[in-house]
Amino acid sequence: MTKTYDLAIVGGGIMGCSTALRLAEDGMKTIVLDQGDLGQGASGVNAGTLSLQIKRVKLMPYALKGHSEWEAMGEAVGFKKTGGFTLAFTEHEAELLYERQALQADAGAPITFVSNNALRAAEQNLSHKVLAASYCPEDGYANSSLTGQYYRIRLKENEVQFREKCNVKLITRNSSGFNLTTSCGTVHATRLLLAAGAWLKPIAAHLAVDLPIRTRVNTVSVTERMSPLISSIV
């Protein structure tokens, strides 16, 4: 039997789940569909860095709001506010750092420039080749592997429907919205949100939309357990 929703969200990562929660609070009947498990795609296997210093200036208002959301999640997602530094090692890098961070500060980020003495006092193990550094007290990190569990609990608390291990095979339009043929049945929704991240391109192709998306994979190195070398985000 086809079930009808106000909104179907394809992708159960941070963007999909957080959107579903907010819309459910506003009374929309929403379902989240994910080909794997909630929060176990890119949302669950990243380094978890939460730094305002690496955000684009135009996106700073959204970054500030997002940062406050992470802080509100707190211990449930392993949120820690440590403060963070951005470093420059050459004159050219220092020039770019001053230019970029000044713009970010003007956009609302609490970023300041610190002296080498202040940097050394905070992080004694950093290289002495650093020429310039900026600091943001709001920077920190979260444990990305906990986000799926967090959102699963929140979705259940708010009675938001979700389907895991549910592959979307076909999306078609009709007079009242969209039909989604999936491995767990057919879903009809008045509205559709594609939040599939790196998998967005083939999903959008169902609607004859060719998105210019490229996937770039970063790596995280895991070593034997050691004593901490630094306490801030760098």
Model-derived regions, located:
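Glycine-rich FAD pyrophosphate-binding loop
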Residues: 24-44
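Helical element adjacent to the flavin cofactor pocket in flavoenzyme catalytic cores
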Residues: 134-191
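Short loop/edge segments at beta-strand edges and connector loops
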Residues: 34, 81, 115-116, 164-166, ...
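Conserved Rossmann-like nucleotide-cofactor binding loop
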Residues: 15, 38, 199
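Conserved dinucleotide-binding and phosphotransfer motif residues
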Residues: 26-28, 107, 158
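Dinucleotide-binding Rossmann-like beta1-alpha1 core, especially the glycine-rich loop
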Residues: 47-122
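N-terminal Rossmann-like FAD-binding beta1-loop-alpha1 element of flavoenzymes
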Residues: 5-31
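Flavin-dependent oxidoreductases
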Residues: 18, 49, 171-234
